[in-house]
Amino acid sequence: MKSLSAWLLALALVVSPLGAGLWFNQAYLGWLNESIPDANAYAAAWQETVDGQQQLRHPAVIHWLPSACLCRLLTLPHAVQISAEAAENGFNIYQFNGADRGLGEIRSVLLEPVLGASPTILITDTSGQVRYVGAYSDGIRCASGDSLVTSFIADPQALPSHRVVGLNVQTCRCLSP
């Protein structure tokens, strides 16, 4: 009887992490563009949100990592790293509705439902135009290798002249944080 209990315990210890991993994969890991049907409306809504924040100084890196989003925990180290690099390169650093150390000044904003996929990073140029909005990077921790974000924060003067919407990535995302 003792042997059967030990085997059942061992089986439970093996199956539980597999089940948790499957649940996480189904609930949080996926293609960001599947969650946002209209990239143009998504980008326009973010631009409208930025325009409504008159106190923001540009160029800026803006983080949105809602506290209710499990992916926030995985993305946070990369977001802090991006903030430090961007600040060194002349960007102002902000976070919307957050309170994380290392992510810049906190701004409380009312976000539209269309902005429901997170984590999200925005990069604005000197005139306040959003030049990048989307994922930090691809991968489960939003931090796999160099990304567009890394190249964009290297120099505020070298941002693209058009808006880039970074949704074509498989990453950890929360749909309704």
Language-model-derived ranges and their functions:
Residues 137-177:
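Thiol-/selenol-based redox modules, centered on thioredoxin-like
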Residues 51-72, 79, 153:
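Short active-site neighborhood of thiol/selenol oxidoreductases, capturing the structured segment around
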